[in-house]
Amino acid sequence: MASRTVLLPSAVLILRLLSLGLLAASLALIAADKLNVDSDPPQRYTFRDVYAYRYVLAVAVIGCAYTLLQLPLAAVSIIASGNNKRGIGAGGGSVAVALLVLVLLADVVFALLLATGAAAGFAFTYDVKRYLDGQFDDDSIGTPEVDKLHRDMDKFFDLAYAAAGLMLAAAACMALVIMLSVYSLARQVRSDYI
């Protein structure tokens, strides 16, 4: 059975790994999202054609890089906790607290960035999908070309919704990491000064 001191850093590592997986899936979905329109000339739309989707992709890339940088710190924290040390900045008193606060602030900025990426993806997709659904009047529904275009557009926007949803789930994971980090910081400050 894992000791109680290892549970908190282990939970943080698991949440960071989950966040990385969600961001990688979001990145894959938004990068693969495309819409082909059979017109004269044929047109193809991808995330590059929509600034909000470019932002979602950029946030996913930055998020993956940040999470990959944080994974070794989470692993070191588990090892140090298993050895009855304090993890990041072990034994440094106020230096350890300063490092924990720095990591915590970086996590907050990262969580906010993820939330804005998800919001941009959701907001643009909702507005454009609602507008385009209103453009398909009842007279044009039923023709095979229009039905195919409508299905293709729905698929394009559904993939964008999925990418934004995965990014929102990654932001929720980071919010949990922040809560666990604040608890750990409060526990460490209490043990240092009381």
UniProtKB/Swiss-Prot annotation:
Annotated TM spans: 11-31, 56-76, 95-115, 162-182
Keyword Transmembrane: yes
Cytoplasmic compartment segments: 1-10, 77-94, 183-194
Topological domain ranges for the Extracellular compartment: 32-55, 116-161
Main location group: membrane
Location(s) in or outside the cell: Cell membrane
InterPro entries linked: CASP_dom
Gene Ontology annotations for the cellular component aspect, listed alphabetically: plasma membrane
Recorded topology in the membrane: Multi-pass membrane protein
Keywords: Cell membrane, Membrane, Transmembrane, Transmembrane helix
Pfam family, one: CASP_dom
Organism domain of life: Eukaryota
Record note on quaternary structure: Homodimer and heterodimers.
Family: Belongs to the Casparian strip membrane proteins (CASP) family.
Name of the protein: CASP-like protein 4D1
